[in-house]
C-alpha cells in the first residue's frame, strides 16, 4: 500500500464522524420542534438552547473535515 492510498483511507475514516453529526442534528431539531409544540411559552429559552446545541454539534463536523483535509493534503 502506498502513501496516497493510506491517506485516502485515513481521510475516509476521519469523516465517519459526520454520520454521528447528522444523527445528532436530527435528534436536536426533532426534540426542539416537539418541545415547542408542547409548550409554546418556553420557545425563547428552548430555541436558544437548541441553537447552542446545533453550533456545538456542527463544530464537531468542521473539526472532522479539518482533520480529513489535513490528512489528505499535508
Curated annotation (Swiss-Prot):
<keyword id="KW-1133">Transmembrane helix</keyword>
<dbReference type="InterPro" id="IPR002379">
    <property type="entry name" value="ATPase_proteolipid_c-like_dom"/>
</dbReference>
<keyword id="KW-1003">Cell membrane</keyword>
<dbReference type="GO" id="GO:0033177">
    <property type="term" value="C:proton-transporting two-sector ATPase complex, proton-transporting domain"/>
</dbReference>
<keyword id="KW-0446">Lipid-binding</keyword>
<feature type="site" description="Reversibly protonated during proton transport">
    <location>
        <position position="58"/>
    </location>
</feature>
<keyword id="KW-0997">Cell inner membrane</keyword>
<feature type="transmembrane region" description="Helical">
    <location>
        <begin position="9"/>
        <end position="29"/>
    </location>
</feature>
<protein>
    <recommendedName>
        <fullName>ATP synthase subunit c</fullName>
    </recommendedName>
</protein>
<keyword id="KW-0066">ATP synthesis</keyword>
<dbReference type="GO" id="GO:0005886">
    <property type="term" value="C:plasma membrane"/>
</dbReference>
<comment type="subunit">
    <text>F-type ATPases have 2 components, F(1) - the catalytic core - and F(0) - the membrane proton channel. F(1) has five subunits: alpha(3), beta(3), gamma(1), delta(1), epsilon(1). F(0) has three main subunits: a(1), b(2) and c(10-14). The alpha and beta chains form an alternating ring which encloses part of the gamma chain. F(1) is attached to F(0) by a central stalk formed by the gamma and epsilon chains, while a peripheral stalk is formed by the delta and b chains.</text>
</comment>
<comment type="similarity">
    <text>Belongs to the ATPase C chain family.</text>
</comment>
<dbReference type="GO" id="GO:0008289">
    <property type="term" value="F:lipid binding"/>
</dbReference>
<keyword id="KW-0813">Transport</keyword>
<dbReference type="InterPro" id="IPR000454">
    <property type="entry name" value="ATP_synth_F0_csu"/>
</dbReference>
<keyword id="KW-0812">Transmembrane</keyword>
<dbReference type="Pfam" id="PF00137">
    <property type="entry name" value="ATP-synt_C"/>
</dbReference>
<dbReference type="InterPro" id="IPR038662">
    <property type="entry name" value="ATP_synth_F0_csu_sf"/>
</dbReference>
<keyword id="KW-0472">Membrane</keyword>
<dbReference type="InterPro" id="IPR035921">
    <property type="entry name" value="F/V-ATP_Csub_sf"/>
</dbReference>
<feature type="transmembrane region" description="Helical">
    <location>
        <begin position="54"/>
        <end position="74"/>
    </location>
</feature>
<comment type="function">
    <text>Key component of the F(0) channel; it plays a direct role in translocation across the membrane. A homomeric c-ring of between 10-14 subunits forms the central stalk rotor element with the F(1) delta and epsilon subunits.</text>
</comment>
<dbReference type="InterPro" id="IPR020537">
    <property type="entry name" value="ATP_synth_F0_csu_DDCD_BS"/>
</dbReference>
<dbReference type="GO" id="GO:0046933">
    <property type="term" value="F:proton-transporting ATP synthase activity, rotational mechanism"/>
</dbReference>
<comment type="function">
    <text>F(1)F(0) ATP synthase produces ATP from ADP in the presence of a proton or sodium gradient. F-type ATPases consist of two structural domains, F(1) containing the extramembraneous catalytic core and F(0) containing the membrane proton channel, linked together by a central stalk and a peripheral stalk. During catalysis, ATP synthesis in the catalytic domain of F(1) is coupled via a rotary mechanism of the central stalk subunits to proton translocation.</text>
</comment>
<dbReference type="GO" id="GO:0045259">
    <property type="term" value="C:proton-transporting ATP synthase complex"/>
</dbReference>
<keyword id="KW-0375">Hydrogen ion transport</keyword>
<keyword id="KW-0138">CF(0)</keyword>
<keyword id="KW-0406">Ion transport</keyword>
Amino acid at each position: 500500500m502506498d502513501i496516497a492510498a493510506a491517506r485516502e483511507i485515513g481521510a475516509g475514516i476521519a469523516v465517519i464522524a459526520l454520520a454521528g453529526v447528522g444523527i445528532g442534528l436530527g435528534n436536536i431539531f426533532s426534540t426542539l420542534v416537539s418541545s415547542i409544540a408542547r409548550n409554546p411559552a418556553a420557545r425563547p429559552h428552548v430555541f436558544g438552547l437548541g441553537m447552542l446545541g446545533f453550533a456545538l454539534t456542527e463544530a464537531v463536523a468542521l473539526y472532522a473535515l479539518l482533520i480529513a483535509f489535513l490528512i489528505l493534503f499535508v
